Amino acid sequence: MKLFNSFSNKHYDIVHWYPRITVIDSKFAWNTDQHMDHEFYGDFGSFNVEITLPNHYVADGTGTLLNEQEVLPDTLRKKLDINNFIKKPYNSPPSVITKKDGTKKTWKFSAINVHDFAFTADPTYRIGETNWDGVRCIALVQEPHCAGWVNCSKYIAKVLEINSYNIGPYHHPKMIVADAQDGMEYPMLTLCGGFDPEYRSLLIHEMTHNWFQGMIGSNENYRAFMDEGFTQFYTADTYQYIDGPLMIEQKPKSNYVEKFTEPVRVLDDQIYNSFYANAVIRNEELPLNTHSDDFNGGIRHGGGYGQVYTKTAAMLKNLEYVLGRSFFDKAMQHYFKQWKFCHPYPEDFRNSIIGFTGVDLNWFFDQWLETTKTVDYKIGRIKHKKNDVYEITFKRKGSMQMPIDFVVIDKNDSARHYYIPNTWFEKPTGATTLPRWIGWGPKLKPTYTATLNIGTKIKNVIIDPSYRLADVDMTNNIKHGRINVRFDSHVYNPLNWKKYDVRIRPSVWYNGFDGAKFGAVMSGDYLLTKHVFEAGLWLSSGLGQAYLDSTVKINSFNKVSFFIDYKTSLNRYIKKSNVYLQLKSLDGLDAGTIGFEKRSNNNKTRVYTHLKAMLRDMPQDMVYLINDQEWGYRKLNSAIHVGLEHNYKYKRGVGTVLINLRSSAFTNDYDFSAATISSVNKNDLGKININTRLFGQIGFGNNLPSESMLYTAGANNEDLMDSKYNRSMGILPPNWGNYGNVTNHFTAGGGLNLRGFSGYLLAQKNADGSFNYNYKGATGAAFNTEIEFGELFKFMNPKFMKNSVKIQPYIFGDAGIINTNPAGTANVMSDLMVDAGVGTTLSIVRWGNLYNIKPLTIRFDVPFFINRLPYAENDYFQFRWMLGINKSF
């Protein structure tokens, strides 16, 4: 049962009856599988149901309403008609049609040849109805939403018409679509939500279940793809028949967003975008012929369960590609006619299709259902022979074989279509059929050369111009025009799986030495996976320089600065792995990184190794730093890192453990190594969040780079280089980052994170009268905690902010120790250092309609208490303040 409140009315969806009668079928006899939070498997039968409800409720459900005139007389039905409410403002409070008087009504239903019964009830339901071919098409809409559901009953009729034509006749007397804040299917009843036109794909999907889950009765507990995947295919197919090839969406309110929002193909939105996300981005492929409970250990829809929707839909689209549309339609209609009300299994489906077509399609079903093979074809060399004869070479890089449709575009933009069969079957086509290409995998006949007499020069060659072939790398399916270059508008558009996507935008930045910097940032990728890069180039103007010492030559700043980040997938060789590279000459720092990473199959664990090198080799390079005393001048800081990062979830919380081993390499300037471990946990306890961080490091070496040492109060200079706000002075005054005999005002999360000691040298007098300064070291441990309480006070985040700006106050406490001995000697640890206080963050988490812009967090901490007083302070408890950008951890 699902229950929710709407405008002080209780809404009921009574569904998923359990326990239920066990199904006996031809495969398993008595089917006794446990229910694992997926759909049920039920047998066909007849249901006679009586439901008694308070008098003011409006209800409907599976089957024929036997006493309609009793519970819904004509006078009441007219009052409930949706047309009476379509001019009401959307989401305005409902009226009262029937007053609650303490009496009850009994609704009587009879349903024949169904495997389940469900009903829905709500006092605010209003009714729209259309009739199609004797079938009642009923829309049950909550009155506040009527303005968004005006066309619902007519849309139901269209879906019934198209599905009955393409799949097979609908065998029940009615179809209900209910406004129920859901997306679920039951015989003759679908629970949906949203509004037109956004709800159209949802309505089609849930209604289409009535063919595959409803009338065919596939065992979704066993093989979910036979229902969800087939339904997903026809969701896209039916949508196109009704509304055309592009998704119908509401016009954006912003002219800027409208200008840069690209139209979306129905096939992409409903099938291919998600298919490529699974197959290429997340690399979560499993064979479709997998038990429904084997995805993510049977827990809901994770662990690649989405493949039963989109990989199956892509399989059927590729079966259409293999057979041709007309032949495919007839085969699917035969399957429905043969197996309706009969509980088929995967072998029944493939035998039905093969038997009807008379075509050996075992190679197709074996690849798509039983393996994780992928399609990947490439256009190779195009060789111009004499007399306008061309040789075009194709290469099969993937392990799945398919027939090939391709088009040749000549210099006059005329198109010539060709078809290369991959078996003895040849589909009906208007294209020129070439000799068949029979091969297997990437090694048995992996190349094919087509010899074509074009009669003129070739301009381009494109594999599958219909974009149906589920090729996992479309960038090599076209000879010219593989790259799509566009303005980086930061307006959301789905990923472009057809071409390599490049975005360019202007960029302006600032620091106190370069002044204003003007340049551009370019980024690009194929599905966020292959050849992912971001590069920036700026010219420094010197305009607005600030905080410069009189000894600094104001025009000695670096005139040009740049960075390049690059990463690409190595999935072809090692699953879920990447190689990455970074080069930069930015704000006085020349640095480079090259590394390798590998993620676990569930993406929770990442192991990595990389070599990182840094150098500041000019006097002016030191001017950029917030603290210019904490970096080795003209010293190469080069180190190898090996690490492991693990993310986990638990009840009411999430956590991350990071282990990093580091050792100097390829440098004579430093000798150091360190082992670091940190554990961060964020616990959501309702209106209070408790965040904790446990940190430890052991360091070794005789010559340690100051910029990479462990700092008591926060991040070291090396870590500051990862933030554009902190890598240079100017955004914040440089004197805030200096160390002295009092605390200071700059804070950045990292190190031991004892924020109350920011800027304090932590001097400790030795027996011989000398001093040690404990603000940095090589070995230490700390515990940090923050208790956030902003959700207790609604005024902290008022509605007008629309979740764009978030204010989060908290209480914090930090405790830690650090080594006090000189480098290369036995570790001697400091006394425990403690701070405590209050703080708040102001985070801009959404930038209006702009997409994919990182949040900005400004942090203000007031450590009222520290247990080691600076020389110039007298009270452990007093007002101190620190300002930083980004959270402490």
Spans of features found by a protein language model:
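Surface-exposed extracellular loop regions of Gram-negative outer-membrane beta-barrel proteins
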Residues: 521, 532-534, 556, 562-565, ...
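Hydrophobic alpha-helical and helix-loop surface patches within well-folded domains
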Residues: 109, 138-401, 407-412, 416, ...
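Glycine/proline-rich low-complexity spacer/linker segments in large multi-domain proteins
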Residues: 1-47, 68, 467-496
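Outer-membrane beta-barrel initiation region
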Residues: 414, 446-453, 464-572, 627-651, ...
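Hydrophobic helix-coil surface modules that form long, contiguous segments used
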Residues: 19-29, 37-204, 233, 245
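C-terminal outer-membrane beta-barrel translocator/porin domains of Gram-negative envelope proteins
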Residues: 506-508, 548-552, 578-595, 608-610, ...
